[in-house]
Amino acid sequence: MVNLKIKKIDDAAILPECAHEGDAGLDLFSVEEKVIKAGESALIGTGIQMELPPETEAQVRPRSGLALKHSITVLNSPGTIDEGYRGEVKIILINHGKEDFKVEKSMKIAQMVIKPVLKVKVEEVKELSSSDRGTGGFGSTGLKK
């Protein structure tokens, strides 16, 4: 287990937490109230800053309950928070529903999963090795068996 260092920058901030032992995602909480109109998006503050463990990233993902019950999701999903970022963690939520949605203080608005990052060196080549798939993509495997 590694430590995730969190700094509260708002009195209303709640530390990220897993709802159940073994959960991959840490719930992120709103520190503000804001209405997201139907079809629109909004940037919601969490009131926290963090220091990620070395060679990791945080992926911000939607909460399934908000998506199913209210059509609220994370716009750039998954959102990536890089290891070196030290600003406030903010979440871009979008309302895909037909009614306005009110984000309330202390509401669980997203989840965050900490993932290892593989460091790569970009190498330009003239040719790539062949594969069974080749250049097939965008539906090339069909919809049915």
From Swiss-Prot:
It is an enzyme of class 3 (hydrolase). Substrate binds at R63, S64, G65, N76, T80, I81, D82, K90. One of its GO terms (biological process) is dUMP biosynthetic process. Its cofactor is Mg(2+). Pathway: Pyrimidine metabolism; dUMP biosynthesis; dUMP from dCTP (dUTP route): step 2/2. One of its GO terms (molecular function) is dUTP diphosphatase activity. CDD domains: trimeric_dUTPase. Its EC number is 3.6.1.23. Gene3D superfamilies: 2.70.40.10. Keywords: Hydrolase, Magnesium, Metal-binding, Nucleotide metabolism. It holds the Pfam family dUTPase. Belongs to the dUTPase family. This enzyme is involved in nucleotide metabolism: it produces dUMP, the immediate precursor of thymidine nucleotides and it decreases the intracellular concentration of dUTP so that uracil cannot be incorporated into DNA. This is Deoxyuridine 5'-triphosphate nucleotidohydrolase.
